[in-house]
Structures are given as C-alpha cells and as structure tokens.
C-alpha cells in the first residue's frame, strides 16, 4: 500500500510540475534580458530552480513549502508506533506471569500439583487425591474402608476358638467307660478236642472282656494291639493235618464235647 501511494504521489507531482515549467518558459522567453557585463547568473540549486527568476515577472504559483524529507507520506501518523511491531489489539490488562491461561485461578493452587476439582477441606498430606476426604485424614496413610472394630491383637484369625484347646493333643473320641483290665482274646468254650484243630468257630456266647471285630467304644486297652486272638490252648498232641477218623472230614469227630449253647 505504501509503495502504491508513493508512486501515485510522484505521478501527481510530475504532472503538476510539467505545465508549470512550460508556463514559466513561455513567460521567461519574451521578458529575458541579457545580463549586465561582469555579472554571471547563479547555477541551479538541487535542480529545483531553472535559473534566476525574471525581475518583475508574474509567478503563477508560489511554493507551498519544503517537500517532506524522504518522500511524500499520504497519511500522517496518528500517534507513536508501538514498540516491537504492530499489534492488532491492545492488551486489556497486565499479562499473567508465566504464560497465558485460559481461566484465572479461583483460589490458591493446592500443594502437590494441579487438581481438576477444588478440595472441599484442607488438602491431605502426601500428594493429590482425586476425591477430597469427607473428614479428617486417617493417620498412617489412606484407607479405603474404615475399620468397624479394633483390629486383632496378633494377626488375622479366620475363626475364633469355640472352647479351650485340648491339653495334650487331638483326641478322636472321649472314653465312654472304664478300660478292661487286660487283653482277653477269647475264653475257651470247653475242653479242646483230643484229635486236632477244627475249622468251624464256636457257636456259644461271646467271651466277656475280649476283643471283638467291632471297634471298641472306649480307649484302647493298655498293652498294645493284638492281630488275632487265640481260640484256645493248642492240643496236647501237636497239629495234625488229617483227623484220625478216615472219611469223616465234613463233620465233627465222634465223642466231641460241645459247650453250653
């Protein structure tokens, strides 16, 4: 824009000086007189004067004033230019220290870093938290859930004991009666046969006090386990593989005393 205005002003000045110079030449030609002897005309200064002005001649236009230094300016400045370059909008106030901020702070920033929500109470010591505490912070660090009662004194216990522990060790079953005085395998139902052992067991009543195939309802007898009780004293004559009576192996031998039924 400045270049265009400068060229337009130069063209206007050149077009205005053209007819003025022609009028001055036409006026100076008939009124020109030879200079007196010994007098020399002055040379033109800076190219603005073509010669000495004619004495007594008319001048159509006096100079309006000295031309501006450096070229014509279309518009004078309205005020001093801003330092540092043109600015489209003047600042409405002092700029914030540290850089532009879109929103001014509503209060003092919390210690420890920016938070999206302002705290509803005093900030907790130890760092930013997303949600403010509804009461005083717990001593020792944040806890998700407050304890409902006093903590256990020694450690976590899944189930409290329902009674006093056993004094010596685990006992599967308490004694329901007095133990027997000694191991008694089986009493004899009668005198043993004189001919050898027999395969069938006695059909009489069970012996009082001896072990039976069913488990005892009281503590084990003092003396140790016994694998198999003896059915009676061995025969006096030694074991015999075959009975003395030939052909009578399926039944009892003749003359065998039977016990009480």
From Swiss-Prot:
Biased segments, Pro residues type: 32-44, 51-237
Cell location: Secreted
Comp. bias intervals (Low complexity): 238-261
Keywords tagged on the record: Repeat, Secreted, Signal
Main location: secreted
Domain of life, source organism: Eukaryota
Pfam families hit by this protein: Pro-rich (PF15240)
UniProt signal peptide: 1-15
Name of the protein in question: Proline-rich protein HaeIII subfamily 1
Name of the encoding gene: Prh1
């Amino acid at each position: 824009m400045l270049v265009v205005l400068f060229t337009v002003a130069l063209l206007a000045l050149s077009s205005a000086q053209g007819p003025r110079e022609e009028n001055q030449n036409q006026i100076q030609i008939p009124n020109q007189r030879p200079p007196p002897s010994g007098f020399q005309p002055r040379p033109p200064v800076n190219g603005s004067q073509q010669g000495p002005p004619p004495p007594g001649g008319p001048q159509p236009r006096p100079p309006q004033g000295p031309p501006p230094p450096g070229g014509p300016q279309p518009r004078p400045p309205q005020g001093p230019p801003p330092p540092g370059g043109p600015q489209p909008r003047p600042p409405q106030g002092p700029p914030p220290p540290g850089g532009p901020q879109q929103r001014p702070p509503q209060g003092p920033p919390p210690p420890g870093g920016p938070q999206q929500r302002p705290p509803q109470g005093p900030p907790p010591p130890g760092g930013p938290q997303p949600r403010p505490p509804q009461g005083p912070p717990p001593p020792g660090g944040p806890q998700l859930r407050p304890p409902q009662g006093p903590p256990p004194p020694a450690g976590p216990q899944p189930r409290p004991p329902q009674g006093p522990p056993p004094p010596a060790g685990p006992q599967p079953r308490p004694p329901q009666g007095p133990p027997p005085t000694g191991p008694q395998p089986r009493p004899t139902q009668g005198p043993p046969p004189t001919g050898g052992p027999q395969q069938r067991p006695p059909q009489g009543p069970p012996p009082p006090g001896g072990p039976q195939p069913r488990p005892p309802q009281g503590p084990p007898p003092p003396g140790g386990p016994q694998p198999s009780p003896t059915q009676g004293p061995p025969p006096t004559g030694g074991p015999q593989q075959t009975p003395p009576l030939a052909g009578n192996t399926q039944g009892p031998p003749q003359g065998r005393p039977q016990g009480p039924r």
